Each structure stands twice: as structure tokens, then as C-alpha cells.
Amino acid sequence: WYMVQSGLVNNVDVSHFRLSIHLLFAFIILSLILWNYFILNHDEKYEKNLINYLPEILLFLIFLQIVIGAFVSGMDAGKIYNSWPLMGNSYFPDDNNLLNLFKISAFSDPSLVQFIHRNLAYLISFIYLILIVIVYKKNINKLFKPINVLGLIILLQIILGILTVLTGAGIIIASLHQFSSILLISS
């Protein structure tokens, strides 16, 4: 009701902030269910250091990406800057100032939200690449399949994200992009 109520006052669109909170709670519930399942089926302990925290960092960034994706969806930000890899004619949206990126109002600006969503995807991909190199370098055989599945889902999500941008957030591609985020958080 909290989310829907925002669309009943002044305009018919729901608040992108409330939409993202609603979505985030759904993903937290799903993740807790999966986390408990995996903990019950896994009793191995390992030393915590920066490298071993990378999966948690990656998971946090994926959650953040889903929230920013809800902002993109709620603001129809996917319908602007329908080019990739550039946003129009430049890396940074030309309707904005770089300094605006560091203001809280950036989360209410469609072009900046799309910029953040794109760049967070690049960061997630980079951290994934670090993880896969570590897994293969340390020859952790039991993680080969899960890390490869994760990589395929990240690749699927990136391809669907690019297609979503190029199609101006066409409903079928955009819906597949949103659905594959469930696969991503579940992997």
C-alpha cells in the first residue's frame, strides 16, 4: 500500500523510491530463504580476509544495482539515451553536469540514474572477473560450476540491459531484464 499510495496523489506514477523499497524487500526475503538453504547445506568455515569478502561485496553491489534498476524503471529512465556504450555522444549524459552526480538529487534525475545503473554494471562485472580469476588461480574445483553459472547470468543480464537501452525500454526486453535480476540474485 505504501508504494501504491504514492501514485494516488498528484500524479498517477508511483514513487521510484517506494517502488525500489518494495522490490528490495522482495529480494531480501528471497535472498534470506536461499541463504538459509545454503547455510544448512554447508558447514565449511574459512578465514575472512579482503579476498574472501569479495562475494559479499558483489552481492551488496547486485542488491544496490537492483535498487538503482528500480529507479530506472520507476522514472522511465530507460527510455532516454537509447545508445550504448555512449549516452548520446559522450560517456557522461550531455544534459547534465558531472558535479550533479555527487548530489542527493542525482537519484531523482533520469539521465544520472541511468548513468549510475550502467556504471554499477561495469563495476559488478569487474569484481566478478576478479573472483573468477581467484577461483581458477587457487584451483577451487567446487566453485568452478557456480562461478561459471554466475558469469553466464551476469552476461545475460548485461546483454538484456544493453538491449533494453537500445530498444527504448521495450516492454518484452525490459521485462526479461527485470526477470533475469531474480536469476542473478538467486545465483
Describe the residue ranges of each PLM region.
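Polytopic transmembrane helical bundles with strong interfacial aromatic enrichment
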Residues: 1-187
